[in-house]
């Protein structure tokens, strides 16, 4: 019985970090708000890429939910310090609303130095402008 309890405790300690990551401790999230409507921008494709010596490598992709968010954009692999970018594919979003836009894609480059922190990239969007910052 003692061995069973010990094995259960050890298994839960090993599985806890993976379960925590899957449960919402992903290090990267994004949020898009449409400044023209004051509402979230659902259905926007967002691509995560890592800078390598010879260019950019795609790590993950997702679409914003009804609240304009992707809560877990980091792939299921350990984070590493380095340069990354998220590319917001906004052209399709405006096309679906039958609106023109000057920015069909918005690449936002950022640097990860501490892999134990959370990085949030909000995008405030309109047809002819945008702003972004490191959120929380």
Curated annotation (Swiss-Prot):
Q: Which residues form the signal peptide?
A: 1-20
User: What Pfam families does its record include?
Assistant: Transthyretin (PF00576)
Keyword Isomerase in record: no
The UniProt entry, under InterPro entries, shows:
Hydroxyisourate_hydrolase, Thyroxine_BS, Transthyretin/HIU_hydrolase, Transthyretin/HIU_hydrolase_d, Transthyretin/HIU_hydrolase_sf, Transthyretin_CS
Q: Where does substrate bind?
A: 31, 69, 133
Q: Which NCBIfam families match?
A: hdxy_isourate, PRK15036.1
Substrates-to-products reaction catalysed: 5-hydroxyisourate + H2O = 5-hydroxy-2-oxo-4-ureido-2,5-dihydro-1H-imidazole-5-carboxylate + H(+)
What does the subunit section of this Swiss-Prot or TrEMBL entry state?
Answer: Homotetramer.
Q: Which organism is it from?
A: Salmonella typhimurium (strain LT2 / SGSC1412 / ATCC 700720)
What EC number(s) does the entry state? 3.5.2.17
The family annotation for this protein states: Belongs to the transthyretin family. 5-hydroxyisourate hydrolase subfamily.
The GO terms describing molecular function are: hydroxyisourate hydrolase activity
Query: What EC class does the entry list?
Result: hydrolase
Its function, per the record, reads: Catalyzes the hydrolysis of 5-hydroxyisourate (HIU) to 2-oxo-4-hydroxy-4-carboxy-5-ureidoimidazoline (OHCU).
Q: Which UniProt keywords are given for this protein, alphabetically ordered?
A: Hydrolase, Periplasm, Purine metabolism, Signal
Entry's localization field: Periplasm
* GO BP annotations listed: purine nucleobase metabolic process
CDD domains from the UniProt entry: TLP_HIUase (cd05822)
What name is this protein filed under? 5-hydroxyisourate hydrolase
Q: SMART domains this protein is in?
A: TR_THY
